[in-house]
Amino acid sequence: MNSTHHYEQLIEIFNSCFADEFNTRLIKGDDEPIYLPADAEVPYNRIVFAHGFYASAIHEISHWCIAGKARRDLVDFGYWYCPDGRDAQTQSQFEDVEVKPQALDWLFCVAAGYPFNVSCDNLEGDFEPDRVVFQRRVHAQVMDYLANGIPERPARFIKACLLYTSD
C-alpha cells in the first residue's frame, strides 16, 4: 500500500478518470480553491485546489462529483459561499450544503488511506460550531451512500484510489 500522500497522485488519479470524458482537470492552485469551466482562453474545465493541500484536492473533487451538468458550466458551480466568520444561522446553512461533499471526502479519504476530519470551516465565527453533531450528520450520509449506492463519478474515483493505493 502507498503510505505517502502527495497531491500529484490525486491529480494523476483524477485526470486519468475524468480528463477525457468530462474535459476536466485537477490543478494545484496558489490561492483559494475554485472551479473554472472551459472558456476562450483555456479549453478544459479546471478544479483548482488550494496551495497543494491533499485534503483541499479531495474536497474540491467532492464538490465536482456532486455538481450536475448545468452547474459544471458555471464558475464555482454557481454555489453560494460565505467565508469564515459566519454567525450561527449562516453556519447552519453552510453545514447543510457541506454534508454530502464531506461524506464523499470521507469515502475518498478511506479509499486513499488518508485521514479524514470534518471541517466546520468557521475559525473566526462568533460562536463554536458543534463539530460532533456535524460529524454525525456527515457519517449518516456516508452510511446512506453505502446502503443505497454511491453515484457513478464518485464510485469511479473511489475505485481508482483503491487501485492506486493497492500497488
What are these regions (language model features)?
Residues 164-167:
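Conserved small/polar residues in nucleotide/adenosyl-binding loops
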Residues 96-110:
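An active-site-proximal "capping" alpha-helix that borders the catalytic cofactor pocket
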Residues 108-122:
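Short helix/loop segments within enzyme catalytic domains
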Residues 140-157:
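Helix-rich interaction surfaces within compact, conserved domain-sized segments
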Residues 68-98:
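Post-HEXXH active-site segment of zinc metalloproteases
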Residues 1-40, 91-96:
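Auxiliary, metal-adjacent structural segments of Zn-dependent hydrolase domains
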Residues 42-55:
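Short pre-active-site segment immediately N-terminal to the catalytic Zn-binding motif
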Residues 55-68:
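Active-site recognition of the HExxH zinc-binding catalytic motif
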